[in-house]
């Protein structure tokens, strides 16, 4: 369910059409995107837009109840992992609901992206900077 305004029409539309437990993936520039998945390609050049900026814009619009990340994200890119977890904690505080965080192996993560209604590609070049958001409800 949408919460605010977003300029990218494709991403805004996907968020507006999400039902409870539907998923979207926000990924770095290198994550393979399955042919059958809807691709929203925001990448312009390396680093633009960033993973974190895209997560912030998405969280401003989307109510989430679950997060899935690769186990490798914590150890290979700990600073960015911590930034993401800080945003998730802030989202929990703002909405007053707990958000489940699950870790799975990266290979399993890539397979799980097939369940997403859309995969949003950023210009991020930090290893494992990928997240799956599970849609919640605003009530």
UniProtKB/Swiss-Prot annotation:
Give the Gene Ontology MF terms in alphabetical order: D-ribose pyranase activity; intramolecular lyase activity; monosaccharide binding
One Pfam family name from the record?
RbsD_FucU
Q: Which keywords does this chain's UniProt record carry?
A: Carbohydrate metabolism, Cytoplasm, Isomerase
Task: Output the Gene Ontology cellular-component terms.
Answer: cytosol
Q: Cite the annotated pathway.
A: Carbohydrate metabolism; D-ribose degradation; D-ribose 5-phosphate from beta-D-ribopyranose: step 1/2
Q: What is this enzyme's class at the first EC digit?
A: isomerase
Location(s), subcellular: Cytoplasm
Query: Residues that bind substrate, according to the entry?
Result: 28, 106, 128-130
Q: Matching InterPro entries, A to Z?
A: D-ribose_pyranase (IPR023064), RbsD-like_sf (IPR023750), RbsD_FucU (IPR007721)
The catalytic site is made up of: 20
The reply to whether Endoplasmic reticulum figures as a keyword in the UniProt entry is no
Q: Which residues are connected by disulfide bridges in this protein?
A: none
Q: What's the Enzyme Commission number for this chain?
A: 5.4.99.62
This enzyme catalyses: beta-D-ribopyranose = beta-D-ribofuranose
**Biological process annotations from GO:** D-ribose catabolic process
Give the multimer and partner information. Homodecamer.
Role of this protein: Catalyzes the interconversion of beta-pyran and beta-furan forms of D-ribose.
Q: Tell me which family the UniProt entry assigns to this protein.
A: Belongs to the RbsD / FucU family. RbsD subfamily.
Protein name (Swiss-Prot/TrEMBL): D-ribose pyranase
Q: Which organism is it from?
A: Aliivibrio fischeri (strain MJ11)
What gene codes for this chain? Answer: rbsD
């Amino acid at each position: 369910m949408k919460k605010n305004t977003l300029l990218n029409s494709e991403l805004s539309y996907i968020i507006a059409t999400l039902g409870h437990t539907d998923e979207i993936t926000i990924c770095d520039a290198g994550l393979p995107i399955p042919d059958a998945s809807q691709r929203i390609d925001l990448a312009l050049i390396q680093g633009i837009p960033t993973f974190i900026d895209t997560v912030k814009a998405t969280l401003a619009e989307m109510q989430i109840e679950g997060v899935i990340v690769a186990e490798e994200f914590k150890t290979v890119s700990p600073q960015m992992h911590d930034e993401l977890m800080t945003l998730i904690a802030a989202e929990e505080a703002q909405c007053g609901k707990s958000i489940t965080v699950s870790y799975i192996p990266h290979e399993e993560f890539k397979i799980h992206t097939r369940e997403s209604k859309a995969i949003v590609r950023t210009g991020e070049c930090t290893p494992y900077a990928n997240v799956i958001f599970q849609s919640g409800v605003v009530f």
